C-alpha cells in the first residue's frame, strides 16, 4: 500500500490506479541483478515465492526481460529469469513495435502502447510485467437501476455520473471509526476467488486522511471487521487509465540506491548499467456486469465497526481495492474525478 500512498499524495484531486503485483514483479527482476545496498533496498519489494503463479481464471500475469543482443549477462541472473529472457536489438525500431504488440495482446488491447517512444541505443535491458483481470460480479447490477446521480468531487463541486444501484442484497460491510476519520467499508464479490473492497469516508472531503493511514495492516484489520448484512449499494460506473513514472515515488520510499548511476547491478552483467526509468500503465473498467483491469510496468536499464447502516452510496471520492480471497492485493485505486476518466 505504500507505493499507492506515495503516488496518491503527489496527485491530489486525480484518479489513481495501480497494480502492486505488476510493480513488484519488475522490482524482483531488478533485485536478481542487484548487489550491495541496491539489493538490500530492493529486497523489501521482492515478490514472495508464495505469491508467484497464482494466476486464476480472472487474473493472469506475464513477465518478460529483453536484453541487448551484444551484452554479456551473468549466468546466475539468467538462471533466475529463466525462459522469460530474450535477446533483442534495441536499435531496431521494430523491437519497440514487437514489445508493444506483446503487451497489447496479453492485456486484450487495454495497454497500448506501453512504450511511447523509441528506446535509447544505450538500453541494455528492458524488464516488463503485465497483468490482466476480468471478472463478473457474483451479484451483477441491473442496468435498469443505473441512472444519473450527483457525485461530489468536493463539498462545493458536483458532477453527474452513471450510478449503478443494487437493493437489499447481503454484503460484508462495516462502519469504522478511527482517530483520523470515520468511514464505511464494503466487499463486493466477483465470481471466483476475488472481490472489490470499497472504502468510503463519511465526509465528502475525508479521503486524504484515510489514504495517509492506508497500510497493509490497517486494511486487513478493517476487512476483518466486516460482517454480512443486507444493504443497498450505489457505485459509479467508471473507466480510468493511468500512466506513471514510478522513480520519484520509489526514491521517496527509500529506494535511493536503485535508480541512476548509484545503482549496483553487478550481478546482472559485466558492464556498468543504470535504471533510468520505471513506467507503469494501467486501465480499469467497472460496469454493471464485470470489472476489467490491466496494468503493465517496465524498467529501462541503461548503460473497527460501530453503528450499522443500510445504505452504501459512493457519491464522493473513495478508495477501491481488488484482492484475492487469500488477501493478496491485485489492484488499488482512488476514484475522485469523474471528468478525467
Curated annotation (Swiss-Prot):
Its main location: host cell. GO terms for molecular function: cysteine-type endopeptidase inhibitor activity; protein sequestering activity; serine-type endopeptidase inhibitor activity. SMART domains: SERPIN. GO terms for cellular component: cytoplasm; extracellular space; host cell cytoplasm. The record marks 303-304 as: Reactive bond. Pfam families: Serpin. Keywords: Host cytoplasm, Host-virus interaction, Inhibition of host caspases by virus, Modulation of host cell apoptosis by virus, Protease inhibitor, Thiol protease inhibitor. It comes from the Viruses. InterPro entries: Serpin_CS, Serpin_dom, Serpin_fam, Serpin_sf, Serpin_sf_1, Serpin_sf_2. GO terms for biological process: symbiont-mediated suppression of host apoptosis; symbiont-mediated suppression of host cytoplasmic pattern recognition receptor signaling pathway via inhibition of TBK1 activity. It is found in: Host cytoplasm. Transmembrane segments: none annotated. Belongs to the serpin family. Poxviruses subfamily. Viral serpin that inhibits both cysteine and serine proteinases involved in the regulation of host inflammatory and apoptosis processes. Major anti-apoptotic protein which inhibits both intrinsic and extrinsic pathways and strongly cleaves host CASP1 and CASP8 but is a rather poor inhibitor of host CASP3. Prevents the proteolytic activity of host interleukin-1-beta converting enzyme (ICE) and ICE-like enzymes. Can also block apoptosis through host tumor necrosis factor (TNF) receptor. PANTHER family: GH10112P-RELATED (PTHR11461:SF211), SERINE PROTEASE INHIBITOR, SERPIN (PTHR11461). This is Serine proteinase inhibitor 2. It comes from Cowpox virus (strain Brighton Red) (CPV). The gene is OPG199.
Amino acid at each position: 500500500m505504500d507505493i499507492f500512498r506515495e503516488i496518491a499524495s503527489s496527485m491530489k484531486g486525480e484518479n489513481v490506479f495501480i497494480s502492486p503485483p505488476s510493480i513488484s514483479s519488475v522490482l524482483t527482476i531488478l533485485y536478481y541483478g542487484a548487489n550491495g545496498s541496491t539489493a538490500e533496498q530492493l529486497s523489501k519489494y521482492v515478490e514472495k515465492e508464495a505469491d508467484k503463479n497464482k494466476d486464476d481464471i480472472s487474473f493472469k500475469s506475464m513477465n518478460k526481460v529483453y536484453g541487448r543482443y551484444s551484452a554479456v549477462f551473468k549466468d546466475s541472473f539468467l538462471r533466475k529469469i529463466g525462459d522469460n529472457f530474450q535477446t533483442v536489438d534495441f536499435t531496431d525500431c521494430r523491437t519497440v513495435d514487437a514489445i508493444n504488440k506483446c503487451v497489447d495482446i496479453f492485456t486484450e488491447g487495454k495497454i497500448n502502447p506501453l512504450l511511447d517512444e523509441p528506446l535509447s541505443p544505450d538500453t541494455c535491458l528492458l524488464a516488463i510485467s503485465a497483468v490482466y483481470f476480468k471478472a463478473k460480479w457474483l451479484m451483477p447490477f441491473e442496468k435498469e437501476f443505473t441512472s444519473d446521480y450527483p457525485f461530489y468531487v468536493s463539498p462545493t463541486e458536483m458532477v453527474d455520473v452513471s450510478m449503478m444501484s443494487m437493493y437489499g442484497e447481503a454484503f460484508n460491510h462495516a462502519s469504522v471509526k478511527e482517530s483520523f476519520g470515520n468511514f464505511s467499508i464494503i466487499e463486493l464479490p466477483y465470481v471466483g476467488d476475488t472481490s472489490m473492497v470499497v472504502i468510503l469516508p463519511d465526509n465528502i472531503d475525508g479521503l486524504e486522511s484515510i489514504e495517509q493511514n492506508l497500510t497493509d495492516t490497517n486494511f486487513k484489520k478493517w476487512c476483518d471487521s466486516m460482517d454480512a448484512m443486507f444493504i443497498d449499494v450505489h457505485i459509479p460506473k467508471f473507466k480510468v487509465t493511468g500512466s506513471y513514472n514510478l522513480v520519484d515515488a520509489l526514491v521517496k520510499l527509500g529506494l535511493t540506491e536503485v535508480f541512476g548511476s548509484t545503482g549496483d547491478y553487478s550481478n546482472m552483467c559485466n558492464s556498468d548499467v543504470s535504471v533510468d526509468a520505471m513506467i507503469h500503465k494501467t486501465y480499469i473498467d467497472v460496469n454493471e456486469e464485470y470489472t476489467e483491469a490491466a496494468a503493465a510496468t517496465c524498467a529501462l536499464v541503461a548503460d473497527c465497526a460501530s453503528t450499522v447502516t443500510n445504505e452504501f452510496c459512493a457519491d464522493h471520492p473513495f478508495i477501491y481495492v481488488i484482492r484475492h480471497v487469500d488477501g493478496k492485493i491485485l489492484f488499488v485505486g482512488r476514484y475522485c474525478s469523474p471528468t478525467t476518466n
